[in-house]
Amino acid sequence: CFIQGVDDCIEDIMELARSEAMLFKFGSGTGTDLSTLRSHREKLAGGGRPSGPLSFMRVYDQIAAEVKSGCKTRRAAKMQSLKVWHPDILEFIECKAKEEKKARVLIEKGGYEANFNGEAYSSILFQNANLSVRVTDDFMEAVLADKTWATQWVTDAAKAGPSWPARDLLGRMAECAWGC
């Protein structure tokens, strides 16, 4: 497996997509920390809004789904992580569990097959990567002390992003991991 980096620019974001596809083609796996990509809450230099790491995770997920490992039948091996200080951390934590809920509805109410290669799972997102939150000692200390955890902007670490009770955030990590 290869650990890859990505810079916060569209050229690098798309280069990562190409690089992952080629690595999958030749039978390898990849892992990428997406904490370098600014939050959807931040601003672009031209005044617009970025789409955030989750939007590009959708693209990377589809590449992993379509380019099988070694161009055979085995699924691509893929990991994505986000640091616990990232402003989009809650959306990252919850994204796969939300998609799993959709799959359950499709299976239970729509009559779709429950196997992983069936239509229910092929129609939802975030199924082709293991997602990991990169926690810090500071975060774990905030959990133990029952403190609020503040995120920070990617582009300006001095600027505070959203905050949550640290224990609640850790609880969501456990609940969402269990739900998948």
Region locations from a protein language model:
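Active-site cavity-forming subdomains of large catalytic enzyme subunits
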Residues: 2-180
